[in-house]
């Protein structure tokens, strides 16, 4: 069934102990994700976009996913609670999420890509975010597995331990024009300040959110989120900094027959009433971070324990990570050296293979060493070379290199480009011959069997960018990119009928049996362009366009597109600060028709093109109250 388009009305009210809202002065943006240390964005050896705190406040975004819609090369797939994020034609599982440089790795508790969008619910509330850095293209040489498509690093506000306590409270409501669509209500809060002046500080964050269930079959389910976090910051001296973090997030997703879920399921002439579906996801993280800033040497180390629970499917994962990264400043060279150790454990009572004799736990260790050198060969040209070695318990050793150059041709022109390798290790279930994962969507009795002979997926990407900035009120850029993808892990049907002897495993006959294999090669390529114009002191216009295409180079569907991506994407936004207290904004997001795509074992049809237009305003009622409203 086609879900009708809807028009949204959003009202947000925020209160904070802060200075009056004004546009920040133009200044060089500083980023850290491309190299691990601070540098100006025009010098960063990567294609990188930044969503600043000011932009987040101006546009009344609902969450991180909403903010990412305006970034070139980024596609937000799905909708409602099931939004997922893809970069440069790579599927969402190849996008690595970081929070303050630390991994968010939870996909093992939603196998077969069920309930997509879960990872976005683990990200910090907008009130606590300082900026969001988005790297388009592989960064496996620095961050390892999963960073094949790109990296999204959410950087939160620093703890204040020398100033008075400050905070903000933000509440918003979204009312649907179509009364059959669920309304959205959300509140998030942030506070930070000293516990012991100059020595110990703290910050706390919280989020409450609910999206009501649609009264439309195959519409959006009900989603409820409750998030909370606390950070203690200890600064014994000006050179050392310690953070102790704890965060706990809960998500509930509910579907009711006759509302977002069909009242019954029919197989042939037999129909069975559906039951209500209730899913809960729980995520808890603990981490300890040390940062040291010395004369010619900086260091950052952290240890993190991440626990994710899917109680409805009796799945629980544990990811323990220790990471160390150091920068050594040697004249024209900035040397980055580091290492990482990860231990993954998955408990899942859903193993379907009787021959596995009750196997319900999978584990894996891996460690890595990495090095990069940023060499300022001349005043205008910098070359960055990096290499990472990953050692995996199941897959041995993998080497991931990258090389990138930044050339400031003239005062207003910059040429950037490089070659980067990408790497992604198979999931725990995918690599175990003793694991059979249930599948079939509740309509068919199917199973996917793991394969210990799988190889890691790999990619090789090239990009070339030309950027122009008149250092006043105009900027523009164009980037060409190409990615060759090999050893893609895909699902191949062993049999398709319970009458087929091949579909009988351990005395049980399945409707179908699938195997995991490395078969596919693919290519993704495209163009990203951007333009910005500060028309007057109070009026600003930005626009970007992305062209992306993909092609499978081998396998049954050679010559067909790989992923469900629009070839054409266009985003534009106009901001007007009418008075010191009143501002208006508008944005347009156009997505072309998506190509047909490989959906597990067959090609599926794409979706039609669409255009979204949003307009809004912001009003500073007083120094502590900001009111925003919009029509989406």
Predicted segments with their positions:
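Outer membrane beta-barrel strand-and-loop segments of large Gram-negative receptors
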Residues: 321-325, 338, 362, 368-370, ...
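Periplasmic-side early beta-strands and strand-to-turn transitions of outer-membrane beta-barrels
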Residues: 161-279, 487
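Face-selective signature of the C-terminal outer-membrane beta-barrel domain
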Residues: 233-251, 274-398, 402-410, 474-481, ...
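N-terminal periplasmic accessory domains that precede
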Residues: 64-67, 83-86, 97-100, 119-122, ...
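Short acidic/polar hinge/loop motifs at secondary-structure boundaries
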Residues: 103-136
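Gram-negative outer-membrane beta-barrel transporters
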Residues: 168-170, 376-380, 481-484, 504-599
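Surface-exposed extracellular loop regions of Gram-negative outer-membrane beta-barrel proteins
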Residues: 103, 108, 263-266, 345-347, ...
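Conserved C-terminal beta-signal and adjacent last beta-strands/turns
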Residues: 2-12, 192-194, 207, 233-235, ...
């Amino acid at each position: 069934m086609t879900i009708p388009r809807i028009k949204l009305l959003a009202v947000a009210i925020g209160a904070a102990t802060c200075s009056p809202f004004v546009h920040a002065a133009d200044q060089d943006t500083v980023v850290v994700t491309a190299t691990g240390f601070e540098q100006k964005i025009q010098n960063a050896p990567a294609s990188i976009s930044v969503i600043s705190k000011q932009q987040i406040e101006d546009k009344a975004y609902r969450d991180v996913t909403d903010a990412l819609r305006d970034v070139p090369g980024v596609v937000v797939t799905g909708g409602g609670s099931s939004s997922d994020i893809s970069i440069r034609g790579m599927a969402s599982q190849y996008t690595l999420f970081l929070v303050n440089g630390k991994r968010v790795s939870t996909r093992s508790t939603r196998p077969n890509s069920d309930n997509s969008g879960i990872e976005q619910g683990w990200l910090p509330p907008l009130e606590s975010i300082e900026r969001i850095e988005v790297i388009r293209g592989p960064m496996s040489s620095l961050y390892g597995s999963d960073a094949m498509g790109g990296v999204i690093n959410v950087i939160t506000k620093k703890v204040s331990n020398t100033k008075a306590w400050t905070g903000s409270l933000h509440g918003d409501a979204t009312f649907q024009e179509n009364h059959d669509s669920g309304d959205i209500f959300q509140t998030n809060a942030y506070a930070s300040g000293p516990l012991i002046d100059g020595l110990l500080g703290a910050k706390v964050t919280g989020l409450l959110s609910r999206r009501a269930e649609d009264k439309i079959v195959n519409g959006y389910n009900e989603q409820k989120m409750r998030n909370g976090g606390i950070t203690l910051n200890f600064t014994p001296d000006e050179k050392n900094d310690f953070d102790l973090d704890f965060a706990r997030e809960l998500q509930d997703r509910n579907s009711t027959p006759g509302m977002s879920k069909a009242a019954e399921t029919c197989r042939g002439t037999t129909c069975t009433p559906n039951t209500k579906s209730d899913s809960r996801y729980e995520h808890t993280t603990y981490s300890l971070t040390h940062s040291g800033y010395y004369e010619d040497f900086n260091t950052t180390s952290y240890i993190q324990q991440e626990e994710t629970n899917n109680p409805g499917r009796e799945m629980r994962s544990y990811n323990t990570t220790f990471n160390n990264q150091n920068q050594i400043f040697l004249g024209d060279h900035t040397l980055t050296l580091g290492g990482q150790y990860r231990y993954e454990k998955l408990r899942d009572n859903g193993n379907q293979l009787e021959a596995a004799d009750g196997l319900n736990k999978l584990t894996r260790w891996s460690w890595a060493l990495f090095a990069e050198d940023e060499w300022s060969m001349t005043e205008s040209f910098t070359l960055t070379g990096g290499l990472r070695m990953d050692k995996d318990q199941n897959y041995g050793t993998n080497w991931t290199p990258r090389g990138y150059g930044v050339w400031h041709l003239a005062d207003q022109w910059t040429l950037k480009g490089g070659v980067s390798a990408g790497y992604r290790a198979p999931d725990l279930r995918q690599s175990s011959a003793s694991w059979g994962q249930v599948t079939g969507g509740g309509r068919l009795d199917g199973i996917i069997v793991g394969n210990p002979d799988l190889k890691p997926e790999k990619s090789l990407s090239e990009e070339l960018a030309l950027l122009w900035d008149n250092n006043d009120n105009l900027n523009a850029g164009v980037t060409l990119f190409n990615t060759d993808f090999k050893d893609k892990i895909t699902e191949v049907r062993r049999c398709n009928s319970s009458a087929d002897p091949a579909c009988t495993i351990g005395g049980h006959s399945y409707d179908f049996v699938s195997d995991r294999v490395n078969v596919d090669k693919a290519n993704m390529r495209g163009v990203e362009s951007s333009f910005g114009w500060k028309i007057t002191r109070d009026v600003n216009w930005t626009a970007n366009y992305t062209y992306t295409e993909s092609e499978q180079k081998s396998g049954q569907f050679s010559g067909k597109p790989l992923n469900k991506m629009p070839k054409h994407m266009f985003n534009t936004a106009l901001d007007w600060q009418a008075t010191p207290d009143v501002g208006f904004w508008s944005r347009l997001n156009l997505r072309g028709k998506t190509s047909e795509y490989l959906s597990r074992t067959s090609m599926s049809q794409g979706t039609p093109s669409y255009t979204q237009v949003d307009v809004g305003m912001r009003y500073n009622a007083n120094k502590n109250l900001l009111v925003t409203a919009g029509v989406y």
